[in-house]
């Protein structure tokens, strides 16, 4: 530790952040104080405060829809009236299954208004995973957009706790909300420690798990990200194409902008061809990204409006080191602020100094042991411990699993909550790490830290991988595959593909007879598009460990190059699963065959 303190580069990087720090804290600390002194316990109260102080200022816009702060406040009241009429009361959970729109935000805050928790369901889910997401939240009512209603109806019988489905169309104010009372709905008593939303995350148990986010944590996320990452200024506008059912969109987008009273421009989903048109149309000065979005833009043909553009700052995560400088220079982005975190984690890392490729650093937190990287044996799938039974810290630039210390004492809704399922929460905790009785959150990610204290993402561990900006549970995909006739055994892994972000899904299967690619296509069609395997490897058997765990590491090392894999390989195309030969593999590598 003392050698690091003596390092000139480490000292200079700390000083750079100290110089930046007071500027950021001038925004962060006052907000924290104001929320404390004025007893603002929820984002609903922030929205109502904005409506009282700036009723005619723009809050949200999308295409031809514009919502001022006063109109947003009115919409939350009308949503609350509808929910109350459906029997929703304080302490209930309401599932929200809808695409991005200003009404989405009004719906979430309307649920707060009646004292309910909003379960934000991934719009890509269908069939059993969708039914599970609704059922595990214990929601009795689902608020769904008309474009997604049919998918929900198809699995309605699997949702045993579900009583009501409330559907809204493209103009909910003339439809679902048309006959609501004009009088404001009285606010339910909401405390900062109450659950605000459930955000679903995929993990090793397979199906989506709801992660609990309190009102306090939602406020803290926005209060920190607004000044620290965006450095919001008068006249700013945030453009968000990321789904609002994810933490990035709702907590790091909506919460941050609302607390700073910065308007947001939304889009239903990302479009590379329309991105710069929208940026100019909305005069967006800040954008929220995931790495895949940046890669799409960099690999897109030149757009007449890409330069000059009004974007000053881009905030997000997952930006690959090779894409970072190309994205910044091609589009003239003044500042890129990368971060690392997870919805269920008790902390995050932020890169406010702009070092390319890094997810950031926490100089004081790192010294205090808040973040630790420990030795992890990928082949044995276990942490290494010393003769005393404690974990072994990694040296500089040594790859290991990132751990985040769980505070022993926290209050006011800021304590670590994890998932609604206590057993799932328990699986994310590692105890007796460096001393008896301590506990850390397992990130499930491999990172390294350099001599200057900067952290770098390396890979995911085990049973999840990331593709198209979504976490894919290998257990969930394998479960769907093996539930269909024709497949005796299956395992799923993520494999890197040249010039692609994340990892593509590879299903290694042992068929009961001759492999039928059309039958396999039908078997995985209920999975979200991003979770459907891009590659299939047909094998005679799957090697297992002494404890009968399927050995995945050899499959990962061998990958999907047909010149080095002896088994038949298939690749997912628009026509279905087709044999992957060396010619098709070349098309994949050079981008002619889209995955």
Residue map of PLM features:
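Structural core segment of the AMP-binding/adenylate-forming
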Residues: 2-19, 81, 85-86, 109, ...
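Conserved AMP-binding/adenylate-forming core of the ANL superfamily
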Residues: 35-40, 44, 56-101, 105-109, ...
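Conserved pre-ATP/AMP-binding loop-to-beta segment of ANL
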Residues: 56, 167, 181-200, 207, ...
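Conserved AMP-binding A3 loop
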Residues: 68-70, 189, 196-220
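AMP-binding/adenylate-forming catalytic core of the ANL superfamily
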Residues: 125, 132, 142-144, 404-532, ...
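Conserved AMP-binding/adenylation subdomain of ANL enzymes
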Residues: 219-237, 247-285, 300
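Gly/Ser/Thr-rich phosphate-binding loop
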Residues: 259, 281-289, 298-378, 419
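AMP-binding/adenylate-forming catalytic domain of the ANL superfamily
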Residues: 526-550, 567-592
């Amino acid at each position: 530790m003392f050698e690091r303190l003596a390092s000139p580069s480490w000292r200079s990087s700390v000083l750079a952040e100290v110089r930046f720090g007071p500027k950021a804290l001038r925004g962060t600390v006052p907000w924290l104080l104001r929320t404390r002194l004025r007893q603002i316990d929820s984002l609903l109260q922030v929205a109502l405060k904005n409506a009282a102080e700036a009723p005619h200022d723009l809050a949200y816009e999308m295409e031809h829809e514009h919502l001022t702060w006063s109109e947003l406040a009115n919409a939350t009241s009308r949503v609350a009236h509808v929910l109350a009429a459906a029997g929703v009361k304080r302490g209930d959970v309401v599932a929200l299954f809808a695409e991005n729109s200003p009404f989405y935000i009004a719906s979430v805050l309307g649920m707060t208004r009646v004292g309910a928790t909003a379960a934000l369901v991934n719009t890509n889910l269908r069939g059993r995973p969708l039914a599970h997401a609704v059922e595990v939240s214990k929601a009795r009512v689902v608020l769904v957009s008309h474009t997604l209603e049919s998918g929900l109806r198809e699995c309605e019988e699997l949702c045993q706790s579900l009583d009501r489905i409330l559907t809204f169309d493209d103009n909910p104010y003339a439809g679902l909300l048309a006959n609501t009372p004009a009088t404001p709905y009285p606010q339910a008593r909401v405390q900062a420690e109450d659950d605000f939303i459930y955000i679903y995350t995929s993990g090793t148990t397979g199906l989506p798990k709801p992660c609990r986010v309190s009102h306090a944590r939602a406020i803290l996320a926005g209060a920190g990200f607004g000044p620290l990452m965006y450095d919001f200024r008068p006249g700013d506008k945030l453009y968000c194409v990321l789904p609002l059912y994810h933490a990035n969109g709702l907590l790091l987008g909506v919460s941050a902008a609302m607390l700073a009273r910065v308007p947001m421009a939304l889009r239903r989903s990302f479009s590379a061809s329309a991105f710069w048109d929208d940026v100019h149309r909305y005069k967006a000065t800040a954008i929220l990204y995931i790495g895949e979005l940046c890669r799409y833009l960099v690999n897109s043909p030149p757009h007449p409006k890409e330069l000059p553009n009004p974007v000053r700052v881009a905030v997000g995560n997952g930006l690959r080191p090779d894409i970072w400088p190309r994205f910044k220079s091609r589009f003239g982005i003044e500042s890129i602020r990368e971060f690392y975190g997870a919805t269920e984690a008790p902390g995050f890392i932020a890169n406010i100094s702009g070092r390319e490729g890094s997810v950031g650093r926490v100089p004081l937190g790192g010294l205090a042991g808040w973040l630790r990287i420990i030795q992890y044996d990928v082949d044995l799938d276990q942490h290494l411990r010393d003769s005393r039974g404690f974990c072994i810290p990694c040296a500089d630039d040594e790859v290991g699993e990132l751990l985040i210390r769980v505070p022993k004492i926290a209050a006011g809704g800021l304590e670590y909550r994890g998932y609604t399922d206590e057993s799932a929460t328990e699986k994310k905790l590692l105890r007796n790490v460096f001393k008896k009785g301590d506990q850390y959150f397992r990130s499930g990610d491999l990172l390294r830290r350099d001599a200057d204290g900067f952290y770098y993402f390396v890979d995911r561990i085990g049973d999840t991988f990331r593709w198209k900006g979504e976490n894919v549970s290998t257990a969930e995909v394998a479960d769907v595959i093996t539930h269909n006739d024709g497949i005796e055994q299956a395992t799923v892994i993520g494999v890197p593909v040249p010039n692609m972000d994340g990892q593509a899904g590879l299903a290694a299967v042992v068929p009961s007879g001759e492999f039928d690619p059309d039958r396999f296509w039908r078997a995985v069609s209920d999975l979200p598009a991003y979770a459907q395997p891009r590659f299939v490897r047909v094998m005679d058997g799957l090697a297992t460990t002494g404890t009968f765990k399927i050995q995945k590491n050899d499959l990962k090392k061998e990958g999907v190059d047909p010149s080095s894999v002896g088994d038949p390989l298939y690749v997912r195309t628009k026509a279905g699963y087709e044999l992957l030969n060396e010619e098709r593999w070349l098309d994949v590598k050079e981008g002619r065959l889209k995955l």
